[in-house]
């Protein structure tokens, strides 16, 4: 076995050992074979790409190796939307008239805050309405949830301190968000699903068509667990997620949608919670990602946090009070910091006024200060420095220099910060391209990909890459990489493993994702166990383990015993994603909530309609007065009172029945007016303003039988 072969811990084994025929250990140096229990594997060759799943294409530049593109799964005659599920704001877009178009939400806005709240009465609020009440309901208002999705508790220590709600761990060390208002703990996927549900409902109204399929974007540097969790969120929301697409890649699709010239572009994506850099070749409908890099712990929230900490420190120095321990004060500080950051994009200084931020025995306390752009940049200087490394890494991985870059595309609201734009100029030597809207371009690109899958867009080929390496835990707690980062997707890699102990029937393998050398520094995607291996001398069984990464960047693992042809069942355990049964339960809960929400909305709409009917009926009775026969009027008034009673205490259906009964009686008013002498036939009756038709002067008009029509002068009878 080659020195790069993986040695894996055996289930119940007592240690690790190299089993290379050259007796090499994992660091490639000679060593003595230790007869301990070990599980080892041998690479079967270079990366194998299943050509049946791809469309072979020639390169644009001529020569070189052939490239592959995934054959899209097309959805016929059904609207597929593109969704940018952001940390701070989200957006949805669709192909309209052959072009990607942003969908406006129910409030008339083009983006929706990624905020969900629960009131004390148990009502759920999503979007702008949830954001508005955050200050008075900080512990039940969930924002920046994207920073927790698909993560373990030990991965979000810093992020959990930046929010006003409680972030707790469950028995599996997964992140849960506590909601005191309804006494429930939510997974991040559930909260994200509620944002997705609103976006899709808004899209359905905008497009006048039910939407059930979507393409959802994620940061390019999201790992497998985070991608899977995002897909689960879509499923909980009742969506079929056709594709998970990287945000910088989506931005490039929107940027290059109508462009024919070949360009090499660098997409600089600094959002609310994550930072990505991707280098792509774009042109002639081909979008090839050359490399990607990033930092999922860096975003606009971190810039806000620096301002919050500065304000809190200054206040504590002056007043001796720690505002960070006050949830309501923390929420006010966070909103003020975000507002100041936005204002400093166009101003050199901004006033920060927070009256009644807290109170002591001496009375209320206020914050009144000025933040300059220079001070803001000083507070965030180390964050700006962290931006450099991913940019340099992405170019190095793409084997390009800055002079090879034609355009630098800025994506994400945080790229509006002048210091960020200046840093991009210094690092790349290019003037950033600001022709795209940084808040909308990702959703527009997702809509283009949705159009490709729906068959609305043709002649576009997308070649994306895996952002992080996939590997296995090997001797000495070392990670041995199997699929390196920036491998074009989809991809497949096989390893042949065998046993290291006589009669061994099962093994356990720890799957990792990351770039660090040691297991402890990388993300564990979970472990899988191979059972049912026929008892045999060590080294005899041949188990082929296949690692597949699909077009969504999501990993799956399968195994086959080459000796018997038997396919082994593999279950991934220990991953920071939700178990299938828990996702199914959340889907059912979401459906139940959707039904409850629909019933509540129906009740509100019915009550509003009933109030309107009562008003219009009372108005008509008053305006027509004595013209209505007494018997008819009594019946209408009786039904009117019944409807009023039902509005106060009846069910939705009872209100609807009472409205129908009242409308039936109101129709008799018109009938009785038609039957009165001089009513003028079927065309007579109450006018829109409630006045009856005049029977005097209008009689000079002859019917519609071809006789002359005489103009009549009308006088106001009042």
Curated annotation (Swiss-Prot):
Mention any one GO cellular component term assigned to this protein in its UniProt record: chloroplast envelope
**Acidic residues composition bias: residue spans:** 706-718
Q: Which ranges are annotated Gly residues under compositional bias?
A: 678-693
Q: Which residues form the signal peptide?
A: none
**What SUPFAM superfamilies does the record point to?**
Actin-like ATPase domain, Heat shock protein 70kD (HSP70), C-terminal subdomain, Heat shock protein 70kD (HSP70), peptide-binding domain
The places in or outside the cell where this protein is found are:
Plastid, Chloroplast stroma
A GO BP entry: response to heat
Q: For the region Disordered, give the residue spans.
A: 671-718
- Effect of knocking it out? Variegated cotyledons, malformed leaves, growth retardation and impaired root growth. Defective in protein import into chloroplasts during early developmental stages.
**Which keywords appear in this protein's UniProt record, sorted alphabetically?**
ATP-binding, Chaperone, Chloroplast, Host-virus interaction, Nucleotide-binding, Plastid, Protein transport, Stress response, Transit peptide, Transport
* MF GO annotations: ATP binding; ATP-dependent protein folding chaperone; unfolded protein binding
Which positions form the organelle transit peptide? 1-92
Q: Which PANTHER family does the record associate with it?
A: HEAT SHOCK PROTEIN 70KDA
Subunit details: Interacts with geminivirus movement protein (MP).
Known role:
Acts redundantly with HSP70-7 in the thermotolerance of germinating seeds. Plays an important role in the protein precursor import into chloroplasts.
The text of the family note is: Belongs to the heat shock protein 70 (TC 1.A.33) family. DnaK subfamily.
Name the record gives this protein: Heat shock 70 kDa protein 6, chloroplastic
């Amino acid at each position: 076995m080659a020195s790069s072969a993986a040695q894996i811990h055996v289930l119940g084994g007592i240690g690790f050992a190299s089993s290379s025929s050259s007796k090499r250990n994992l660091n490639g140096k000679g060593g003595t074979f230790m007869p301990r229990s070990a599980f080892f594997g041998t690479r079967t060759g270079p990366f194998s790409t299943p050509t049946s799943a791809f469309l072979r294409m020639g390169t644009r530049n001529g020569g070189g190796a052939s490239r592959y593109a995934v054959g899209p799964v097309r959805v016929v005659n059904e609207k597929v939307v593109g969704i940018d599920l952001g940390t701070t704001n989200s957006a949805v877009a669709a192909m309209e008239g052959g072009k990607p178009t942003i969908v406006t939400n129910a409030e008339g806005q083009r983006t929706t805050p990624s905020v969900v709240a629960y009131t004390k009465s148990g009502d759920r609020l999503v979007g702008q309405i949830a954001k508005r009440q955050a200050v008075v309901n900080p512990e039940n208002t969930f924002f920046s949830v994207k920073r927790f999705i698909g993560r373990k508790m030990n991965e979000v220590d810093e992020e959990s301190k930046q929010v006003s709600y409680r972030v707790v761990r469950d028995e599996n060390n997964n992140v849960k968000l506590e909601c005191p208002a309804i006494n429930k703990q939510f997974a991040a996927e559930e909260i994200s699903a509620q944002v997705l549900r609103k976006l899709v409902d808004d899209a359905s109204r905008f497009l006048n068509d039910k939407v059930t399929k979507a393409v959802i974007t994620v940061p390019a540097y999201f790992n497998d667990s985070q991608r899977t969790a995002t897909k689960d969120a879509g499923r909980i929301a009742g969506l079929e997620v056709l594709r998970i697409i990287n945000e910088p890649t989506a931005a490039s699709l929107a940027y290059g949608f109508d462009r024919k010239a070949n360009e090499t572009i660098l997409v600089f994506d600094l959002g609310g919670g994550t930072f990505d850099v991707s280098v792509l070749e774009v042109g002639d409908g081909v979008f090839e990602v050359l490399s990607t890099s990033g930092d999922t712990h860096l975003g606009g929230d971190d810039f806000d946090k620096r301002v919050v900490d500065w304000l809190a420190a200054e206040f504590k120095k002056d007043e001796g009070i720690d505002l960070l321990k006050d949830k309501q004060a923390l929420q006010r500080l966070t909103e003020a910091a975000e507002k100041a950051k936005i204002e400093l994009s166009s101003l050199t200084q901004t006033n920060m006024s927070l009256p009644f931020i807290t109170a002591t025995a001496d009375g209320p306390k206020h914050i009144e200060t000025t933040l300059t752009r220079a001070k803001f940049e000083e507070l965030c200087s180390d964050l700006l420095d962290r931006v450099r490394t991913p940019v340099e890494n992405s170019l190095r991985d793409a084997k390009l220099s800055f002079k090879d870059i034609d355009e630098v595309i800025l994506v994400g609201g945080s790229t509006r910060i002048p210091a960020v734009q200046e840093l991009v100029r210094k690092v790349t030597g290019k003037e950033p391209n600001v022709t795209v809207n940084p808040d909308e371009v990702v959703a527009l690109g997702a809509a283009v990909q949705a159009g490709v899958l729906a068959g609305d867009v043709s002649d576009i080929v997308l070649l994306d890459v895996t952002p992080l390496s996939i590997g296995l835990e090997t001797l000495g707690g070392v990670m041995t990489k199997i699929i390196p980062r920036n491998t074009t997707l989809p991809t497949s890699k096989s390893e042949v493993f065998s046993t290291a102990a006589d009669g061994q029937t099962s093994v356990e393998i720890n799957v990792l994702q990351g770039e660090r050398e040691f297991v402890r520094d990388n993300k564990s995607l979970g472990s899988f166990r191979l059972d049912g291996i026929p008892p045999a001398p060590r080294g005899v069984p041949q188990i082929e383990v296949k690692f597949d990464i699909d077009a969504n960047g999501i990993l799956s693992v399968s195994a086959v015993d080459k000796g018997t042809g038997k396919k082994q069942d593999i279950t991934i355990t220990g991953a920071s994603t939700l178990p299938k049964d828990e996702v199914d339960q959340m889907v059912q809960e979401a459906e139940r909530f959707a039904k409850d929400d629909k019933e509540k909305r129906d009740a509100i709409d019915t009550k509003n309609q009933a109030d309107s009917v009562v008003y219009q009926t009372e108005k008509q009775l008053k305006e027509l007065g004595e013209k209505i026969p007494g018997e008819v009027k009594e019946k209408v008034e009786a039904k009117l009172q019944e409807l009023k009673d039902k509005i106060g205490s009846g069910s939705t259906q009872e209100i609807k029945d009472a409205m129908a009964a009242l409308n039936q009686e109101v129709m008799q008013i018109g009938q009785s007016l038609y039957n009165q002498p001089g009513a003028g036939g079927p065309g007579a009756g109450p006018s829109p303003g409630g006045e009856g038709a005049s029977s005097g002067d209008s009689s000079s008009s002859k019917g519609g039988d071809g006789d002359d029509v005489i103009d009549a002068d009308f006088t106001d009878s009042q």
